[in-house]
Amino acid sequence: MKVLFIADPMASFKTYKDTTYAMMREMAKRGWRLFHTLSGELSVKNGLVVADASAFEFLGAQDDHDKNWFAAADKVQTALKAFDAVIMRTDPPFDMQYLYATQLLTLAEQQGAKVFNSGQAMRDFNEKLAILNFSRFTAPTLVTTRSADVRAFLKEHGDIIIKPLDGMGGMGIFRLTEKDPNIGSILETLMQLDSRTIMAQRYIPEIVHGDKRILIIGGEVVPYALARIPQNGETRGNLAAGGRGVAQELSERDREIAETLAPELKRRGILLAGLDVIGSNLTEVNVTSPTGFQEIMKQKGFDVAAMFADAVAEWSVR
């Protein structure tokens, strides 16, 4: 198989924990031909969606800081439909450039490319707003552009979390209580004087035990979750915010949530998704670049990357 990864520069990968690296390593073991491009290197020429793609040989990292784990050839402009699979792994934020990239990916799919996750799925399934489709699994939630609404929500619940709809890695997330002296300045900053839509949720105290990332691949639930434990004094468990990842078996509630969402995600053409769960509450559905493969493999011995590669092979011929 020929597989194109649309991802951040490979020299920037933290190979000891990077999920895209784990995907590439597994596919290289299978003898698949691997290519890399940046989202900014997508374009349309003579009606075809093309990428400045470089074939690369997977050499493997010798230590955690090895930047020479690959050997890349010169870039060649290649139509996306020439690959057996195109894997979109560019991190958010989901800004206008990201939106344009998904639109080009949708056009490429119309031309015969197999893209995972599909451009339409990434556009339609906002990672924060997606939980509103499954409200029986969520804590009380507000979506608004009005700071007055947030103040009323805070008065009702006493302790809330507010966050932007386009962030990642815990960026822009604040915890507010009624006694917080900085409510006004936080709302002004995050909501940009009532011009930016945000989400507010009742604070879930179980966050002190971490939030859990539950992976769904090809409509099947990975049997282990990655609990992300916040640092002392933090309310964010995100690994990018300094959280510590601990792999653990799914609880009955975890499995109920995941098995309810899995068929809907599959129906929408979402090959890989990461559900974020705090306590018994679904808080996010990540469809852009879910992580956690390496931590689960190292701690539990379950080969998530192999499960993913199997799904790519199956879905690419559908």
UniProtKB/Swiss-Prot annotation:
Binding site for ATP: 154-210
Cofactor(s) required, per the database record: Mg(2+); Mn(2+)
Cofactor, free-text remark: Binds 1 Mg(2+) or Mn(2+) ion per subunit.
Domain (ATP-grasp) ranges: 128-313
Metabolic or biological pathway: Sulfur metabolism; glutathione biosynthesis; glutathione from L-cysteine and L-glutamate: step 2/2
Record flagged with keyword Manganese: yes
Keyword Methyltransferase: no
Annotated Mg(2+) binding sites: E284, N286
Family of the protein in this entry: Belongs to the prokaryotic GSH synthase family.
Protein name (database record): Glutathione synthetase
Provenance organism: Neisseria meningitidis serogroup A / serotype 4A (strain DSM 15465 / Z2491)
Organism placement in taxonomy: Bacteria, Pseudomonadati, Pseudomonadota, Betaproteobacteria, Neisseriales
